[in-house]
């Protein structure tokens, strides 16, 4: 009866002096894995506007159908997204939208800290997707 107690005590003492596995999350942060897919963001072109040409491929390839696009043309005849909405509550973060984009406008970010008390902030518009670039160096 005393032998199992001594074995358990020896194991406890052995682990007591080893490096802790736990991190103190809010103060310490683990960098995401190389292939981590967080919330999406848009890249800007040389004019400072979104690179998106509103081709609709991301909307067509999305398995959860969380992307909605309305297109328009500017005075130079270039297409742009008049309305681009990404519903992050429906998104499964598969990365198909990033792969399908022919101009490299949308990217999967590294941001994994995104908590809001209401659902409305999870509807990402063009402006919010351009802003999200700041959270993804």
Language model segments and positions:
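Basic, alpha-helical nucleic-acid-binding regions used in initiation and control of genome expression
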Residues: 94
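Non-ligating segments of multi-cofactor redox enzymes
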Residues: 1-85, 89-90, 99, 103-137
């Amino acid at each position: 009866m005393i032998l199992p107690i001594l074995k358990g005590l020896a194991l406890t003492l052995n682990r007591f002096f080893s490096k802790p596995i736990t991190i103190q999350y809010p103060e310490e942060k683990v960098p995401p894995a190389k292939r981590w897919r967080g919330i999406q963001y848009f890249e800007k072109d040389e004019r400072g506007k979104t690179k998106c040409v509103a081709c609709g491929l991301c909307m067509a390839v999305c398995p959860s159908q969380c992307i909605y696009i309305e297109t328009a043309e500017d005075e130079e005849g270039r297409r742009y997204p008049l309305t681009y909405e990404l519903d992050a509550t429906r998104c499964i973060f598969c990365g198909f939208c990033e792969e399908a984009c022919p101009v490299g406008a949308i990217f999967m970010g590294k941001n994994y800290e995104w908590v809001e008390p209401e659902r409305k902030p999870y509807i990402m518009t063009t402006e919010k997707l351009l802003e999200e670039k700041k959270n993804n160096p």
